[in-house]
Design a protein with these regions (language model features):
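Intrinsically disordered, low-complexity Ser/Thr/Pro-rich tracts
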Residues: 6-9, 260, 264, 345
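N-proximal short alpha-helices
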Residues: 130-145, 225, 229, 247, ...
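Non-catalytic regulatory/interaction regions at protein termini and inter-domain linkers
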Residues: 2-103, 371-383
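Regulatory and interdomain segments flanking nucleotide-handling catalytic cores
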Residues: 12, 20-28, 101, 105, ...
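Alpha-helical transmembrane segments and their helix-membrane boundary motifs
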Residues: 75-153
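… and, occasionally, acidic/histidine-rich disordered N-termini of signaling adaptors
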Residues: 68-80, 149-336, 386-402
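C-terminal catalytic subdomain
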Residues: 12, 21-36, 53, 325, ...
């Protein structure tokens, strides 16, 4: 029996909302006296507590360390001779940072370092001419200029990503369609501004809508951010076009794979996906799994089944053969589609949420509606992850049979 869980289970709260502005603790307010200083602190901290700011800083530092260490470790694997490993990695980290700047900004950074090292040197010429070199002010100004240039680039990129994110939201449904005998809910949380995950629920043709035959899709493009988002957009367009021709599911997946293979950069840009057709009149669901995390069917009695029939991910082999399969949904059943970002989410100890915890969460699902079930599952993930920075796109689609 469906019920409103809003008072019992919080909804799926994005990372940024989970660190929402709050009033600083009294100890902080006592230390920051005066209206202007207090207002300044509120402005730069957005009202977040010191422990939240520290968690955010450590998450940023950990992500940056991992980003730069990728180059450092790769370089160290190639060149192991000579200096101690610490020195080699420190050198590689330095050059990894420097070479990510434009040539002009590299010159500014090196000049600032030279002036910083040169500051404090004492000089004498004869008995009358003596003094100290002090370029601290010039060094600070150069570093501030470099920071301003980098921030300008970041703000511009962020604005472009926000526009891309807005466009991407047009490609996925804003709300689930109404389906006789079933309740549907979905949600997606990108790691970055744009995502490589794709979900959909639509009637491919007018006759399908009249018959109530619904297409359900979840997919995950290899890679992240802009490249994955662009490939996701082409996948969505080609899927809708082919599905609109009324092709059977087995033929649809073959044609979609051929298209994906022709635009996969020799198999480097592949896509995992699950496509399903649901007929409310018979409660029959036909599906095909193209190398994706298998959707999990939880029966009303608590038993679980994995939907694994299918074939290779899209875009790897243009001649791949796919197998379709069918299941029958019964009253009280729940079908959960999800991407690998769910099971690969990790906590502050770098421990993955994993398939076992995910299965346990699905087995523990109360007899609620699709939206409440979705919130229940995602809360399990959020409780495990805490405030650890998200490492991949997370998408989930839930179908509850009435």
């Amino acid at each position: 029996m469906s019920r409103d869980a809003s008072h019992d289970e919080p909804g799926w709260i994005p990372y940024t909302s989970r660190m929402s502005p709050v009033t600083p603790p009294s100890g902080t307010a006592d230390r920051i006296r005066g209206g202007k200083l207090s207002g300044f602190w509120q402005r730069i901290s957005e009202g977040r507590r010191l422990d939240e700011l520290w968690l955010q800083f450590t998450a940023d530092a950990r992500a940056s360390y991992g980003f730069y260490m990728t180059d450092a470790v790769a370089e160290d694997m190639v060149n192991r001779r000579g200096r101690p490993r610490f020195v080699r990695i420190a050198k590689t980290l330095f050059w990894s940072l420097v070479m990510k700047l434009t040539p002009a900004r590299r010159v500014l950074l090196i000049l600032a370092f030279v002036l910083l090292v040169g500051s404090g040197f004492h000089f004498e010429f004869g008995n009358d001419v003596k003094g100290d070199f002090n370029f601290t002010f010039v060094t600070v100004m150069l570093l501030l200029l470099l920071l301003a240039l980098e921030l300008a680039d970041k703000v511009t990129m962020k604005r472009d990503l926000e526009i891309a994110r807005e466009i991407q939201t047009w490609l996925v449904p804003s709300k689930p369609p109404e389906v006789a005998g079933a309740d549907i809910a979905f949600a997606s949380r990108p790691q970055n501004s744009v995502a490589g995950d794709y979900y959909d629920a639509f009637y491919p043709t007018l006759s399908a809508e009249e018959n109530g035959k619904l297409m359900l899709v979840i997919a995950d493009v290899a890679g992240k951010s802009i490249p994955a988002a662009l490939l996701m957009a082409t996948l969505q367009a080609s899927l809708r076009t082919i599905a609109g021709e009324g092709s059977p599911l087995g033929e649809l997946i073959v044609r979609l794979n051929r298209y994906a293979s022709a635009h996969s950069l020799d198999g480097r840009r592949f896509t995992t996906a699950v496509l399903a057709e649901y007929e409310p009149a018979t409660r029959r669901l036909v599906y095909v799994n193209a190398g994706h995390n298998p959707p999990i069917l939880r029966r009303a009695n608590g038993a679980t089944e994995k939907l694994e029939a299918g074939g290779l991910p899209l875009g790897i082999d243009a001649g791949a053969v796919y197998e379709t399969a069918a299941i029958e949904l019964k009253s009280g059943d729940a079908l959960i589609f999800y991407t690998d970002g769910v099971v690969e989410a990790f906590d502050e100890n770098a421990q993955e949420f994993g398939n076992d915890r995910w299965l346990d969460a699905i087995r523990a699902l109360p007899d609620w509606g699709a939206q409440e079930s979705l919130q229940f599952l995602m809360k399990r993930v959020d409780d495990f992850v805490g405030l650890t920075r998200q490492s991949d796109d997370i998408t989930c689609l839930v179908v509850r049979s009435k």
